[in-house]
């Protein structure tokens, strides 16, 4: 029987959007899938050695806020200076208290499971991102290389 394949395109660079690609990739790899994740545009932030990821409550009104913050601050209040940083700190604390793995831990788990992580070369060049900022083991390729794998995949996800 041929090994199943999962292809993921990761385009978001915020803390809340960083979890799905790594959770799904590591789970699929644990289930025996061959997995490739193609990081493009803001998703490249997830491959940085020192990611500075924040939640974006203003851009996601459906996001439940820790400790009932959504009831204290209407959507307009989330636009106040410092609110994004405060919400990020609160979300990180909540995740830690619930035992949720960090992005760095999930990313390392993916590497150990041989998930292939590909940085979009065009976007790396577009944003003048030095390769030294990225974790070891990242491959660099264009969309055409990813499509070769995605075309053979059993599941393709855009996150």
Swiss-Prot record:
Phenotype seen when the gene is deleted: A mutant strain lacking rhd_2599, tusA and dsrE2, although not viable in liquid culture, is clearly sulfur oxidation negative upon growth on solid media containing sulfide, and shows massive accumulation of intercellular sulfur globules.
Record key words, sorted: Cell membrane, Membrane, Transmembrane, Transmembrane helix
Protein's membrane topology: Multi-pass membrane protein
Parts of the chain that traverse the membrane: 21-43, 72-91
Entry annotated with the keyword Magnesium: no
Gene3D superfamilies linked: DsrEFH-like
Keyword Transmembrane helix among record annotations: yes
Pathway: Energy metabolism; sulfur metabolism
Main location, first listed in the record: membrane
Compartments (UniProt record): Cell membrane
GO cellular component labels: plasma membrane
GO BP terms, alphabetized: sulfur compound metabolic process
Expression induction or repression: Up-regulated under sulfur-oxidizing conditions (at mRNA level), i.e. when grown on reduced sulfur compounds such as sulfide, thiosulfate or elemental sulfur.
Coiled-coil region: none
Record function comment: Sulfur carrier protein probably involved in sulfur trafficking for oxidative dissimilatory sulfur metabolism. May be a component of a cytoplasmic sulfur relay system delivering sulfur to DsrC. Binds sulfur in the presence of sulfide in vitro.
Name assigned to this protein: Sulfur carrier protein DsrE2
Origin species: Allochromatium vinosum (strain ATCC 17899 / DSM 180 / NBRC 103801 / NCIMB 10441 / D)
């Amino acid at each position: 029987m041929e090994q199943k394949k999962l292809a993921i395109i990761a385009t978001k660079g915020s803390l809340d959007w960083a979890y799905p690609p790594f959770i799904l990739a590591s789970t699929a790899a644990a289930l025996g899938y061959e997995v490739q994740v193609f990081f493009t545009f803001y998703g490249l932030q997830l491959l940085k050695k020192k990611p500075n990821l924040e939640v974006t409550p203003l851009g996601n009104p459906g996001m439940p806020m820790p400790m009932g913050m959504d009831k204290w601050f209407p959507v307009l209040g989330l636009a106040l200076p410092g609110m994004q940083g405060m919400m990020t700190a609160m979300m990180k604390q909540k995740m830690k208290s619930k035992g949720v793995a960090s992005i760095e831990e999930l990313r390392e788990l993916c590497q150990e499971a041989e998930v292939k992580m590909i940085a979009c070369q065009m976007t790396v060049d577009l944003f003048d991102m030095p390769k030294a900022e990225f974790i070891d083991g990242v491959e660099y390729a264009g969309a055409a290389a990813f499509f070769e794998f995605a075309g053979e995949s059993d599941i393709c996800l855009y996150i």
